[in-house]
Design a protein with these regions (language model features):
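N-terminal amphipathic/basic-hydrophobic helices that include classical n-h-c signal peptides
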Residues: 1-17
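Nuclease catalytic cores that cleave nucleic-acid phosphodiester bonds
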Residues: 13-113
């Protein structure tokens, strides 16, 4: 890791995103009780991204499985890329390309802090 600030650390905003953060939406949504609603997760991620200057992309299941999309995008996008998931299989698939992998529960708690 190249000295990237951790979750919750203060950063100076600028026009360049510090990292592209790919969020495994269903994994994060279901990581706390009560579960985070879809709209609430989108709103919280947008607020978190704005406050920290990151480009956060919340990935939902569509015609492409979310895990497959995240694994593909982490290879295609320019670093630094952070992945938010607690899914062991997905973590294995992205570990060589992600600068940082954040657990879904940790991220959900940070969003609600």
């Amino acid at each position: 890791m190249r000295g990237a600030p951790g979750i919750g650390s203060a950063t100076v905003r600028n026009d360049t995103p510090m990292a592209i953060v790919l969020v495994d939406a269903e994994n994060v949504r279901r990581s706390t009780w009560p579960n985070i609603g879809k709209d609430e997760l989108e709103r919280l991620c947008a607020e978190w991204a704005h406050a920290r200057g990151h480009d956060v992309r919340v990935i939902w299941e569509t015609n492409e499985i979310a895990d497959d999309r995240i694994a593909r995008e982490v290879r295609e996008l320019d670093p630094p890329i952070w992945i938010v998931t607690s899914d062991r299989e997905l973590r294995e698939r992205v570990r060589d390309h992600a600068e940082r992998i954040i657990g879904g529960g940790s991220f959900a708690r940070e969003l609600r802090a």
